[in-house]
């Protein structure tokens, strides 16, 4: 699986999330909606996360040294794991805290049309970023399901941005529906419910990302089809009598370490 993808997706998401974060923050000051504030914090967290992913890509390109003879490819795994922690702590935990506060102390939403207009604007930008992530990921996904792609991918940035953008889009839908319900019913508790929903959604996504990126950080081997191709290449040599053992581990998205115990003729 090639590992050069992801840069376009990250940059697109970074620009979109930064613009969305500013728009949502402006919307919060106008409407006093806690769901809008939670979404603003969410978008600022996503923006910082894309910056961390770009940092990881840059640091991974450092040349090997005597202390790091296999290079710095794992930097991309590490920073992807940090992203999951930021999403959980800054995004999910804050949204849950703000949601509980809003449910206990509801506050009417001001300027409904401003709130809905800003959320629709954010949905358009986020949908474009998500479409870009899906388009680039589809190339690497192949015939596998999206769930399988997230588990199999050795390129950490694509699943991270894909799930972040999906979470952001769904969070906007939650915020839009709950802000509308709060105004229709006259019950501002719905605004808090929307904020809590966003917090739960971000928490689930952060946990999934943490599990997958932790697995890459600890070390994952070649995919089954890659192991089969390596085995065929070794056993196809006339000098090889028997392949006793084969082990592999990704040292970075672009570096696969292979160790083989071979009996020669």
Q: Residue spans of the language-model regions?
A:
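Alpha-helical transmembrane segments and adjacent TM-loop junctions that form the membrane-embedded core
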Residues: 6, 73-265
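Residue-level hotspots within pore-lining transmembrane alpha-helices
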Residues: 15, 38, 121-125
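Acidic (Asp/Glu-rich) catalytic motifs at the cytosolic membrane interface
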Residues: 16, 29-58, 96, 100, ...
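Aspartate-rich (DDxxD/NDxxD/DxxxD) Mg2+/diphosphate-binding motifs
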Residues: 53-75, 105
């Amino acid at each position: 699986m090639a590992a050069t993808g992801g840069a376009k997706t990250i940059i697109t998401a970074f620009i979109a999330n930064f613009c969305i974060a500013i728009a949502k923050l402006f919307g919060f000051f106008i409407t006093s909606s806690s769901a809008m504030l939670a979404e603003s914090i969410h978008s600022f967290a996503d923006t910082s996360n894309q910056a961390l992913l770009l940092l990881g890509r840059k640091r991974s390109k450092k040349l090997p040294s005597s202390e790091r003879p296999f290079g710095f490819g794992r930097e991309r795994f590490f920073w992807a794991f940090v992203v999951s922690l930021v999403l959980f702590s800054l995004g999910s935990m804050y949204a849950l805290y703000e949601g509980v506060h809003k449910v206990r102390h509801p506050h009417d939403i001001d300027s409904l049309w401003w709130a809905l207009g800003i959320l629709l604007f954010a949905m358009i930008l986020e949908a474009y970023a998500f479409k870009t992530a899906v388009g680039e990921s589809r190339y690497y996904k192949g015939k596998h399901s999206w769930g399988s792609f997230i588990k199999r991918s050795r390129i950490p940035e694509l699943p991270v941005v894909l799930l972040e953008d999906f979470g952001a889009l769904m969070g906007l839908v939650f915020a839009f529906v709950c802000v509308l319900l709060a105004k229709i019913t006259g019950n501002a508790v719905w605004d808090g419910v929307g904020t809590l929903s966003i917090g739960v959604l971000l928490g689930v996504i952060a946990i999934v990302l943490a599990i997958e990126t932790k697995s890459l950080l600890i070390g994952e081997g070649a995919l089954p089809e890659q192991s089969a191709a390596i085995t065929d290449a070794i056993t196809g040599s006339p000098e090889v009598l028997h392949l006793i053992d084969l082990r592999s581990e990704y040292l970075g998205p672009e570096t696969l370490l292979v160790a083989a115990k071979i009996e020669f003729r």
